[in-house]
């Protein structure tokens, strides 16, 4: 695991962009993408670059179940706004949150991932160490699955909605095993609220109670965090 400590999230986004650019130069064709505030500086750099993604495939980690893609809180909407409107990909896969049969959609998404092995997976991390909607206790062997959102996640996400009742209770999420099958993983973490999660990710035991801790067992992981998020790390892990 490589740790890169930056002064802020803007520099962190640039470091992640450099990894993607190098990967594309080396022939990478499939990017695993995340939503949330952490990857926005990366997507800004991608949009501002002269890179052409029209021959690339993207696969997103997750989507709320029950939200129309046009809803401004859907992850479809997020990706269009922050990346795809300016930089279209050849194929852009995101779970269908309006699928009539959620189990069929889970199977369909697993097939998509199997047919398009991910070269570089971008991740964020939650305060409790979750990655995507894989909350503490999610089996490390999980593939794409439907998720009942925890009360803490519903409360955390309620700030994006008019009230807590509007927050979806279910999501479709790429599983931890699927994430671990990516050739390279780049995890982004910025701000004081991520200090404990970063420390557990890097230093703690590998346990399903901290889903991100499994990344210690991946052969090619880069953690990019700002100085604040890295504040609790043992100095030996900082470069």
Curated annotation (Swiss-Prot):
Q: Which family does it belong to?
A: Belongs to the glucosamine/galactosamine-6-phosphate isomerase family. NagB subfamily.
Task: Identify the keywords attached in UniProt to this record, alphabetized.
Answer: Carbohydrate metabolism, Hydrolase
What pathway is this protein said to act in by its record? Amino-sugar metabolism; N-acetylneuraminate degradation; D-fructose 6-phosphate from N-acetylneuraminate: step 5/5
Could you tell me what reaction this enzyme catalyses? alpha-D-glucosamine 6-phosphate + H2O = beta-D-fructose 6-phosphate + NH4(+)
Q: Which gene encodes it?
A: nagB
Where in the sequence is the active site? 62 (proton acceptor), 128 (for ring-opening step), 130 (proton acceptor), 135 (for ring-opening step)
Name of the protein this chain belongs to:
Glucosamine-6-phosphate deaminase
User: Which terms in the GO cellular component ontology are assigned?
Assistant: cytoplasm
Task: Tell me the InterPro entries matching this sequence.
Answer: Glc/Gal-6P_isomerase, Glucosamine6P_isomerase, Glucosamine6P_isomerase_CS, NagB/RpiA_transferase-like
- Which HAMAP family does the entry mention? GlcN6P_deamin
Q: Which GO terms describe its biological process?
A: carbohydrate metabolic process; glucosamine catabolic process; N-acetylglucosamine catabolic process; N-acetylneuraminate catabolic process
One Pfam family name is Glucosamine_iso
